[in-house]
């Protein structure tokens, strides 16, 4: 089913994100995680690319196909373009179509300093525009409540986002954030800009201080004082930090849902226990 069609049905969409196992890990490890996550009956599951991935790597596509075939849950496959040629992309799009995976989250992808980027696609919008010429794919895009780290201003970032939507992105998923006010402010500005597609709030539970610090550095999200105190207090208490992180994410989600957000996209980090605990606390509100 087209992801964007899941919105506006009188409920808050709830979706999950997983990532493929590392190259030195068996692919079966993600299948075990999916066996638990699918019990939560999410509206869809997105599958990421690894850092520096290119369209010629079909691991993400295979996992997305596995989700749909074995669990009957729609999958949203991430597709990055910074390290891909149009020929790579054509091969992958044909592969996806043959697998019945028609929902794509179109991304530029992170630049790898060790790999010279290809020249065919410069921005996610150019990928969206290209895929729209290739058949009946349904396209989603990313958005940034605290603006993209390469954007000079919120105005510039919204201009790029509006162009991406105009090119064919039908649904947006936000980058992680830890202060809901940033999301609400961004949402208001996006709507005033004429961006009317559904916008999901991306939530990442804080369960590992080093991991969160790395993610914050990569995406530019800020850590509010309340969360900083949690990280400081429980830094060396693994289970306590996990439980506090779950509680913080639940509080965020409850506020977002009560405020009428289109959807919640949970970055699971392949941790079924944490995703399940959060779902248990919020599923009646959706």
For each predicted feature, which ranges?
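Active-site beta-loop-alpha junctions enriched in small/polar residues
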Residues: 18-21, 48-52, 78-84, 109-111, ...
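Active-site mouth loops of central-metabolism enzymes
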Residues: 13-29, 75-87, 140-156, 233-247
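Glycine-rich anion/phosphate-binding loops
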Residues: 29, 81-95, 118-122
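N-terminal amphipathic alpha-helix/helix-capping segment at the start of soluble metabolic enzymes
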Residues: 1-16, 23, 228, 283-286
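Glycine-rich, proline-tolerant flexible connector loops at the mouths of alpha/beta enzymes
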Residues: 21, 42-63, 109-119, 170-183, ...
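Active-site pocket-lining/capping segments in soluble small-molecule metabolic enzymes
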Residues: 119-144, 194-246, 251, 282-286
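Glycine-rich, positively charged N-terminal anion/phosphate-binding segment
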Residues: 3-5, 27-36, 52-73
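Conserved, mostly hydrophobic/aromatic
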Residues: 17, 45, 96, 164, ...
């Amino acid at each position: 089913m087209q992801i964007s069609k899941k919105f506006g049905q009188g409920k808050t969409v709830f979706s999950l994100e997983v990532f493929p196992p590392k190259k030195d890990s068996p692919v079966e490890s993600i299948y075990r995680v999916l066996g638990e996550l699918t019990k939560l009956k999410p509206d869809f599951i997105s599958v990421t690319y690894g850092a520096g991935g290119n369209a010629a790597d079909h691991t993400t596509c295979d996992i997305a196909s596995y989700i749909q075939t074995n669990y009957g849950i729609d999958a949203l496959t991430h597709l990055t373009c910074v390290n891909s040629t149009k020929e790579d992309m054509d091969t992958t799009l044909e592969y996806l179509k043959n697998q019945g995976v028609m929902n794509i989250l179109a991304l530029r992808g992170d630049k790898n300093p060790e790999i010279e980027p290809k020249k065919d696609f410069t921005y996610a919008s150019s990928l969206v525009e290209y895929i729209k010429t290739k058949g009946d794919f349904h396209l989603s895009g990313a958005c940034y409540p605290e603006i993209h780290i390469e954007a000079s201003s919120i105005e510039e970032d919204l201009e790029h986002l509006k162009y991406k939507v105009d090119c064919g992105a039908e649904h947006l998923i936000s980058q992680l954030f830890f202060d809901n006010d940033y999301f609400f402010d961004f949402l208001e500005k996006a709507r005033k800009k004429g961006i009317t597609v559904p916008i999901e709030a991306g939530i990442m539970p804080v369960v590992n201080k080093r991991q969160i610090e790395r993610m914050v550095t990569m995406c530019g999200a800020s850590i509010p004082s309340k969360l900083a105190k949690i990280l400081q207090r429980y830094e060396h208490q693994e289970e306590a930090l996990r439980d506090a992180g779950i509680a913080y994410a639940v509080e965020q989600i409850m506020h977002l849902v009560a405020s009428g957000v289109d959807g919640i996209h949970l970055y699971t980090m392949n941790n079924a226990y944490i995703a399940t605990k959060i779902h248990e606390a919020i599923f009646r509100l959706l």
